[in-house]
UniProtKB/Swiss-Prot annotation:
Disruption phenotype: No visible phenotype. It catalyses: D-glucose 6-phosphate + UDP-alpha-D-glucose = alpha,alpha-trehalose 6-phosphate + UDP + H(+). GO terms for molecular function: alpha,alpha-trehalose-phosphate synthase (UDP-forming) activity; trehalose-phosphatase activity. Residues 213-225 have a biased composition (Basic and acidic residues). The lineage of its organism: Eukaryota, Metazoa, Ecdysozoa, Nematoda, Chromadorea. The gene is tps-2. Coiled coil: none annotated. Residues 196-233 are annotated as: Disordered. Its EC number is 2.4.1.15. This is Alpha,alpha-trehalose-phosphate synthase [UDP-forming] 2. InterPro entries: Glyco_trans_20 (IPR001830), HAD-like_sf (IPR036412), HAD_sf (IPR023214), T6PP_C (IPR049063), T6PP_helical (IPR041064). It comes from Caenorhabditis elegans. It is an enzyme of class 2 (transferase).
Amino acid sequence: MGSEPPPSEKKVREPFSRAMKDVQISDEQRLKELWHLLDLLEIEYKKTADLHTLISSVSESLTMVWKRRDPKSELALKGLLLILEYCLSHVFDGHAVFEIFVSSLGFNTVIFWKHCAGYIFDSDLGRGTKFRDALLFSLTLYDVNTGKNRLRELYAAVPGIRKSLLGVNAKQFGERYHHLQKRLARYGSHTSLCSVSSDSEGEEAIHNVRSGTHTESESEEDPKAPRSGLATSHFQQRVINVSNAPPVSLKREKTGDWEIKQGSGGLVACVDPVMSKDHENLWLANLGMNINDKKQKRPGSVASIPESFPSTNTLGLPLIKQTIAEVFFHVLADDDMDAPKNEKQKKAREEMSLLGVLNNYNRGNYKLNPVVVQEDDYNVYYGGISNGLLWPALHNLPEYIVSEYDDEKILRAHWCAYVRVNYQFAIDAVRNSRPQDFIWIHDYHLMLVGMIMQSLDQHLEVGFFLHIPFQPPGEFFSKYSTVGFAVLRGLLRFTKVGFQTHRDRTKYIELVQHYFGTAKIVYDNKMDIYSITNEGWTCSLGVFPVSIKNDDFLKFVDLPETIKLKNDLRKRVMGDTPAPDGRFFFSVERFDYTKGIMEKLQAYKRYFERHPDRIGKDVLFQIAVTNRRSVDTYRVYQDECIDLADKINEIFKDPNNPTWKPLVFQTDGLPRSELVAAYLAMDIGVVTPKKDGMNLVAKEMLVCNPKAGLVLSTGAGSEIQFTTAGLYSDKEKNYHRISNVFDPDSYCDAFYSAALEPEDVRAEHGKRLHEFIMANDIERWSCAFLDPSWTHEVIRPTQVETLDDFFSLMMKTRNVRRQIVGRVLKGIPIRSHFAISLRNAKESLEQICKPGTHTAEFKSGPDSKEVAHFEIDNELQEFERDLSFIDYVQSDDADNVEQFVDTLISSHPISVETYKKEVENAVELLYSADHFHYFFTDRDGTLKSYSCSYPSSIQPAYSGVIQAQFARRCAQTCVILTTAPLMHIGVLDVSTIPNGYYYFGASGGREWFIDNGHNFKDESILKGEKADVLASAYTRISHLLEEPEFRPFTWVGSGLQKHYGHLTIAFQDVYKTITEAQGKQLHEEIEKIVKDVDPHGTRLQLASTEFDIKVYMKTETDGHVFDKGDGLRLLCEKMHCDLTEGNVLVCGDSSTDIPMLKECLIRNPKGVYTIWVTVNDKLKEEVRALCASYSNSNVAFVSCPEVLLGAMAQATIREITITRTRKMSRNIV
């Protein structure tokens, strides 16, 4: 492509070469550019005048030419870039064509983004464009609409883009500085920190704070790699609450000063108790003060900037235009006011400014951070699609969906605004969060935030609670499919989702089953939790009926002023001389069509028509708090209700009581004290919404007035909760239920039965409701939702009955342990559900052990009578150690490594003193070598104590961390070489160390795993018919083990394993559960099988160890048995390892490891250091003699793997200390 292009090609404009003011060229000009380029490429096309049609028809052809990598490829790439330039210049009106364009790239998106990144960055930096932000939002919208993960592909292609968007480096600097301050505060000085800390990041931070240098720990792959044996964190878990509305109300006085008050809405009442527990908790919300471009424009600054550019910059701030980048601070700082005249006035002004008021609020409460978006976007997102489409649709009231959304163009435009606002909330949430935090998103305004957050950082735990019903009509997924499917898919991207009622969750699951046929749905009957896995994401769904903070209402009940208000109100409503059997009905709600106010009034009118005897007696006091009058559907509905209320008062009059009015209709709300007084004054509460998430009014009424009756519709979530709890049944009806609010006759019957209910019966029913609500308050609701134990990520208590149950449970713990190891190594704090999982697994196994023992019994199959007896002492011990490890790793102590390693003392088979001496000897050997070029080690018996069976021998998390840190700090090339298979219950299945720390050699070194893209095998195995001999032996032995007397050998130890080049049949375990006679009988039968399939003994060789029988296939070259020495040679050949260089550490525990040691001694007799885990004197002597034959005395012996792990940990600490000291010396110099 380096040759000079033909003259005709020079006429094709360079993509992304226009200045900001020239970006919006005409479609006609772009058409001519594309036509010319297509002609040069000789691509056939229809010369249409519609640019979208042309792009849609030629994008795939351009991609094909570009992928060919021929002389025309560069020109085709230029065409693709011109199309991208157009799409990013028309983000909103051109998104449909952008989706087609991205789809046409197929599997080439990553390489395409790499090609185009330079063009985009150069344009933004040199010409003032904002194409980078346009691309980020366009891909976000694409992912939302299609369910793909194209945004993550962009991050993979250009990693720095995500960092700059989220301010990752700034956040890391802040966290390091906080970490450093805490260390300095504890130890008092720089010097003491150096002397006691095992974390060199502290010293590096000191240097970098002073010099501003960049450290290697800020690398993309491992941004938080700890500098010590174990990672620590000084930040505790916070709750980050994210909602559209804030928990406060803001008011600006005429003086310009701001006043902030605690809000009183339902969301605040629900969440405030949780948020107030910790001042570090954070609430993100929109304060109603957003960016208005029209108000912010200044002469010559932004008039030429296209309105189609997105609303966030690369730091996630809502700043479209570079020339008004400071607008966010203008919004909060109130700089439109006159400058203060003196310092005192300046200080007072600062304190009463919005920024000052918020700062003062944050000092005494949890932190409140504003989310600022474009005002036009917000108006469309909130007043348009949220309340004009989502609200009525999710309440199953399609007749109230705004008619403008019948226009697909308007629907898409408003949907873009909804996505943009969710995008901004998601960016702000990620930027303000830490990995250990729980981010709690609320309600239908922000249903896409979880999906967008996961694309930015998949390590975050993000929950969502829907406060309204989820009952969308069928047309939501046909007529409004753009919105419907994105909402359905978006909820599945949260870690956990809470619904108000079982009805809503059931509806959601039915829709997922119908529209996402491949989704896997699992129900846990004990926990009443669904887990749904779709497109690689898993979400847990629970039901959590929201409640109230009882004390917020009860504190008013007995106050003298409340009693007076109650009496005055009852007298005002019922009159001076009310009828003895007259009833005070009370209803209070927002003036919303979902509340069923119109239907209530119609039923109340019918009530007096059918029961004229109630005229002059009963009064309904209806409070309908006016809201959303600016929305046409609300205004019309409210006016019609008021007209009907006036009509009722005109129709029904009592000649004997002229002052009586059947209805008191009020549109102003009441303060809390007066509301409680109304609850106390009423006889019967009326809560009858068409559809409502929960409706807390019913609970407030009965908490305050246990003697009151209740008329409740099935549209209220609280009614479903009461029914589920048994408070309304055939035998016991504690309230008057309305099943159909649209049937005025049955509705008025409920009024009538409530009015005639005897007071003592009514009080008894009210008491039962009161007791239930008191026992299920808001604290219980929030704790239940935040409880980490109910998510799919947690191993729940389970009944372990069969071997499959046991092995499956252990594999689940492997997954948890891998996450623990990965997080600790990266410095990411550990979530609480890891400890819950391990504790649940441990307790599940303890429950099946015989009393006073660690002997577990498992059935060999679900319907089998055979019982396997396992000693699971090691498995339980490793659970206990890992739980202890989690506690230590989260401590702030600089010596948490040493503290945890000290706990391993109890594992020594002899004594504490022996443990300490062995560790000292092993550490001295490691110290003498200083550093190792190569580390070769066995696994089982060396790094891991033997378990009852191989599938249960999961590497514990603490071991994974110690081994990985040793590999990172003390050796260059680390290798685990074992006789176990590689996969299918092999060494990779039971390991918890992340890829990249160790090479894994399996089957004695005949098969190797280097990394995901690099594996190889020994090619010396006999081929053709000769290779079938081992397979024949395996088949014969499998059949043998199916016989009843040999069945126990299928589950003892490693069972029957087929390796690459040999077989292993366990005939004993470490607990000696198999008798000598049984083992001898098995050995004899296997000998017969081997002789039958290889009568001349030229192909197979039988060998026995303490625990198993091995059937080896001889090599093709000289017919000897392949051993670990051969495996090591194979590795050196394939990976070009030169063992003559540097020091080599070899660790083993049995005679099968001797060839590995010998091969190393042959190549590097002086540089080999070896530690053996054994108490066998004969084996010790063999090792000593072998080393002595090469004039090598670098030998140490330990009694158990835990001693070796302790020594490795100590060596790692020493290596870090040396490294730290060297770095400090350099800094001092």
